[in-house]
């Protein structure tokens, strides 16, 4: 499970060093793709394959399902971390997420999310006040 917030920097070649706490789980390979809220989702290869299997259950007759899968899967990129535990984020994904050098890499349970640090700070500021108020509504019986 991925937890916590980390602050690596993007180098000139579009690479970031994976946080130490995430390395063991991600060393076998990752799949990066567009996430909601202009971030990048990073899945283990296994988790992405399971997610894709669930997506394949959606009816092809559904335009919404087709549209979602096209956007989600067309942005996907498989990558294996190098010996220095770095992954290269493709330019298209860096542009999508508006990444600058300063990043926020967060653990989101079954996935990692890569955010531009400024965008992450804005997101937290906008959403922290509603955090306590929405817990019961979003996940009934959680607390």
From Swiss-Prot:
Family matches, as NCBIfam families: division/cell wall cluster transcriptional repressor MraZ (TIGR00242)
GO cellular component terms listed in the entry, alphabetical order: cytoplasm; nucleoid
Principal location listed in the UniProt entry: cytoplasm
Chain ranges of the SpoVT-AbrB domain: 5-47, 76-119
Pfam families with a match to the protein in the record: MraZ
GO biological process, one term: negative regulation of DNA-templated transcription initiation
Subunit structure: Forms oligomers.
Localisation per UniProt entry: Cytoplasm, Nucleoid
GO MF annotation, one: DNA-binding transcription factor activity
Organism the protein comes from: Clavibacter michiganensis subsp. michiganensis (strain NCPPB 382)
Name of the protein in question: Transcriptional regulator MraZ
Alphabetically ordered keywords of this record: Cytoplasm, DNA-binding, Repeat, Transcription, Transcription regulation
Highest rank taxon of the organism: Bacteria
């Amino acid at each position: 499970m991925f937890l916590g917030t980390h602050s690596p920097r993007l180098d000139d070649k579009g690479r970031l060093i994976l946080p130490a706490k995430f390395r063991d789980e991600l060393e076998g390979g990752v799949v990066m793709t567009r996430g909601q809220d202009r971030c990048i989702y990073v899945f283990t290869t296994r988790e992405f394959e399971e997610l894709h299997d669930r997506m394949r259950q959606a009816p092809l007759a559904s335009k919404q399902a087709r549209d979602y899968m096209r956007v989600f899967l067309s942005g996907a990129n498989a990558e294996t971390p190098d010996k220095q535990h770095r992954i290269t984020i493709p330019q298209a994904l860096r542009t999508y997420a508006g990444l600058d050098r300063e990043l926020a890499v967060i653990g989101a349970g079954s996935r990692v999310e890569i955010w531009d640090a400024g965008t992450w700070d804005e997101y937290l500021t906008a959403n922290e006040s509603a955090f306590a108020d929405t817990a019961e509504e979003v996940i009934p019986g959680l607390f």
